[in-house]
């Protein structure tokens, strides 16, 4: 009962390594009414632990000076420290952390009573949110504590951060797997019960459900197992069912108790599914009709003989009759002609799937050769460096 319930690893290793790599390390311990102190130089104790006074405080102060013999640079980056300390304050609601940079007389205080809710709010600052922040904490029977906070916004990126015993896992792990499984199941169940999938004629995926999602997953595990010493991925098998069970229960209740938020979230997911399907069709179209294979294009394009994009020109003309005149008057060596119908579509205001279903827009995309969508678009493949 006198030891920590959870920790990131072997507690003594961290301070031992810091001690060995420091020209000086000083420990001050306030305990049982006495103040103790010990000092080390390059890892060697200068004197035994000794009592230097009385105190009514409790806690330990560790001061260290990185060794210039070991490190070529011993200057601390305050931005890196600030980011990590702010993160720790979010993860431990009510813990007050003070960062002082005595080089420039700077002091930052991190104290977030809202914990993970404030973490999500901080990340989503400046974005339009679709729902109020959903936040819960629960303790499993096997000693695993699960805390989750999430909110959807109007962006198209997923931003999910995972932590085990306050340590970040950039590669996720079993806690992320449990979270994703429960999230997708809960949303699919809600949309099926509301008959939204049949009504909208879409098939949604887990990626659709997480578009625009900001979430923090924090678990406290008595004996965590990681894939490597850097602890970038959690592999403890017992964590997945603990997170999945807790998330299933809490998130399903949230959707039922907040119908307006659930409707907004479902609407965004359906839009994401449509856009994903449209992007898939666009990729298939551009692959079938390779920009280098003009036979794959509709017969409207009269291409030029020049293959160097820097010397090639593309003229977009309105209608077939104008196209005929342009073809007669062009320089075949460097000028290509593509007739299009007038006012084909205002793509700025059209949804992605409607835009890509336009034959004229599809013809233009294929003729230019750059592809479409975040993954496929490549401006270096533009076939004409002058477009008129």
From Swiss-Prot:
UniProt keyword Transit peptide, yes or no: no
SMART domains reported for this sequence: TOP2c
Domain of life: Bacteria
Keyword list, A-Z: ATP-binding, Cytoplasm, DNA-binding, Isomerase, Nucleotide-binding, Topoisomerase
GO biological process, one term: DNA topological change
Subcellular location, record wording: Cytoplasm
Xref: InterPro entries: HATPase_C_sf, Ribosomal_Su5_D2-typ_SF, Ribsml_uS5_D2-typ_fold_subgr, Topo_IIA, Topo_IIA-like_dom_sf, Topo_IIA_B, Topo_IIA_B_C, Topo_IIA_bsu_dom2
Site (Interaction with DNA): 343, 346
One Pfam family recorded for the sequence: DNA_gyraseB
All copies of domain Toprim, residue ranges: 312-388
Reaction(s) catalysed by this chain's protein: ATP-dependent breakage, passage and rejoining of double-stranded DNA
A single cellular component GO annotation: cytoplasm
Molecular function per GO: ATP binding; DNA binding; DNA topoisomerase type II (double strand cut, ATP-hydrolyzing) activity
EC number: 5.6.2.2
Subunit structure: Heterotetramer, composed of two GyrA and two GyrB chains. In the heterotetramer, GyrA contains the active site tyrosine that forms a transient covalent intermediate with DNA, while GyrB binds cofactors and catalyzes ATP hydrolysis.
Annotated function: A type II topoisomerase that negatively supercoils closed circular double-stranded (ds) DNA in an ATP-dependent manner to modulate DNA topology and maintain chromosomes in an underwound state. Negative supercoiling favors strand separation, and DNA replication, transcription, recombination and repair, all of which involve strand separation. Also able to catalyze the interconversion of other topological isomers of dsDNA rings, including catenanes and knotted rings. Type II topoisomerases break and join 2 DNA strands simultaneously in an ATP-dependent manner.
Additional detail: Few gyrases are as efficient as E.coli at forming negative supercoils. Not all organisms have 2 type II topoisomerases; in organisms with a single type II topoisomerase this enzyme also has to decatenate newly replicated chromosomes.
Protein family: Belongs to the type II topoisomerase GyrB family.
Protein's name in the database: DNA gyrase subunit B
Species assigned in the record: Acinetobacter haemolyticus
Gene: gyrB
């Amino acid at each position: 009962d006198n030891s920590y319930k959870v920790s990131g690893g072997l507690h003594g290793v961290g301070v031992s390594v810091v001690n060995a790599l420091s020209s000086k390390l000083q420990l001050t311990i306030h305990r049982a009414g006495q103040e103790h102190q010990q000092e080390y130089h390059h890892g060697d104790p200068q004197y035994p632990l000794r009592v230097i006074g009385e105190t009514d405080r409790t806690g330990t102060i560790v001061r260290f000076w990185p060794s210039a013999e070991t490190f070529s640079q011993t200057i601390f980056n305050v931005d890196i420290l600030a980011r990590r300390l702010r993160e720790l304050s979010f993860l431990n609601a009510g813990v007050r952390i003070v960062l002082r940079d005595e080089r420039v007389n700077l002091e930052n205080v991190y104290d977030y009573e809202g914990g993970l809710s404030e973490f999500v709010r901080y990340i989503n600052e400046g974005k339009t949110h679709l729902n109020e922040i959903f936040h819960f904490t629960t303790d499993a029977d096997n000693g695993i504590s699960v805390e989750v906070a999430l909110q959807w916004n109007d962006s198209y990126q997923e931003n999910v951060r995972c932590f085990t015993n306050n340590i970040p896992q950039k590669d996720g792990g079993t806690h992320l797997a449990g979270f994703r499984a429960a999230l997708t199941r809960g949303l699919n169940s809600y949309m099926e019960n509301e008959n939204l999938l049949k009504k909208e004629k879409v098939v949604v995926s887990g990626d659709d459900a997480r578009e625009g999602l900001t979430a923090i997953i924090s678990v406290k595990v008595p004996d965590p197992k990681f894939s490597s010493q850097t602890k970038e991925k959690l592999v403890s098998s017992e964590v997945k069912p603990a997170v999945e069970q807790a998330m299933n229960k809490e998130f399903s209740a949230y959707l039922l108790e907040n119908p307006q938020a659930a409707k907004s979230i479902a609407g965004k997911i359906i839009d994401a599914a449509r856009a994903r399907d449209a992007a898939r069709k666009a990729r298939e179209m551009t692959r079938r009709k390779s920009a280098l294979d003009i036979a794959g294009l509709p017969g409207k394009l009269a291409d030029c003989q020049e293959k160097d994009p820097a010397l090639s020109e593309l003229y977009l003309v309105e209608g077939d009759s104008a196209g005929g005149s342009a073809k007669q008057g062009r320089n075949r060596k460097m000028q290509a002609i593509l007739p299009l119908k007038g006012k084909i579509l205002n793509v700025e205001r059209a949804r992605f799937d409607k835009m890509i279903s336009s034959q004229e827009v599809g013809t233009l995309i294929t003729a230019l050769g750059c592809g479409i969508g975040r993954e496929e678009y490549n401006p270096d493949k533009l076939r004409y460096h002058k477009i008129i």
